[in-house]
Swiss-Prot record:
Cofactor(s) needed for function: a divalent metal cation
Annotated Pfam families: YgbB
Gene name as annotated: ispF
Family: Belongs to the IspF family.
Statement: the UniProt record of this protein carries the keyword Transmembrane: no
GO BP, sorted A to Z: isopentenyl diphosphate biosynthetic process, methylerythritol 4-phosphate pathway; terpenoid biosynthetic process
Quaternary data: Homotrimer.
Purpose of the protein: Involved in the biosynthesis of isopentenyl diphosphate (IPP) and dimethylallyl diphosphate (DMAPP), two major building blocks of isoprenoid compounds. Catalyzes the conversion of 4-diphosphocytidyl-2-C-methyl-D-erythritol 2-phosphate (CDP-ME2P) to 2-C-methyl-D-erythritol 2,4-cyclodiphosphate (ME-CPP) with a corresponding release of cytidine 5-monophosphate (CMP).
EC number(s) reported in the record: 4.6.1.12
TM segment ranges: none
Cited NCBIfam families: ispF (TIGR00151)
EC supergroup of this enzyme: lyase
Site feature Transition state stabilizer, where: 45, 144
The name this protein goes by in its record: 2-C-methyl-D-erythritol 2,4-cyclodiphosphate synthase
């Protein structure tokens, strides 16, 4: 039985983006498909949703399909300002083509600001509808770096994701 015959597969993803230098009210950061108000925006080629990028990488990794950068390179103008939801759905299609579906996933968002936890219920609702996965199959949490490093200085945001698929 080859690797693709295994009943379960696991992938891990990571992404990081820096914040814009300008600070003004009315900006937002896309996180798990939700616009979270912040005084800075995101520097990115696509919409810059670090959590969806990490999930996409985890799902692609789970299937042995490389990385988000291989499928949607930031050097390709067609992905300029592209929706991260599209990337994740394309990765899910690749999994389905190999007869796999998402069993569960865990996302950790790393930043000092903005505060993430108040938005988690909406994030879960969004991901549940997008991926057709029950909210009981997902976990989203946020941590800080205790003011250490570039994330601790408030220069950006990162996300880690672990995802498990099962053979359907």
């Amino acid at each position: 039985m080859g690797y693709l015959g295994m009943p379960f597969r696991v992938g891990m993803g990571f992404d990081v983006h820096r914040f814009t230098e300008s600070r003004e009210e009315g900006q937002y950061i896309p996180i798990c498909g939700i616009k979270v108000a912040h005084t800075q925006g995101i520097v990115a080629h696509s919409d810059g949703d670090v959590a969806l990028h990490a999930l996409t990488d985890a799902l692609l990794g789970c299937m042995g399909e490389g990385s988000i950068g291989q499928h949607f390179p930031n050097s390709d103008p067609q992905w300029k300002n592209a929706s991260s939801s599209y990337f994740l759905l394309e990765a899910q299609k690749k999994a389905a083509a190999k007869s796999y579906a998402i069993l569960n996933f865990d996302v950790t968002i790393v930043c000092e600001q903005p505060k993430i936890m108040p938005h988690v219920p909406k994030m879960k609702e969004f991901l549940s509808k997008l991926l057709d996965v029950d909210v009981s199959q997902m976990n989203i949490k946020a941590v800080t770096t205790e003011k250490l490093g570039f994330l601790g200085r408030g220069e950006g945001i990162a996300a880690h994701a672990v995802l498990m698929c099962y053979r359907v």
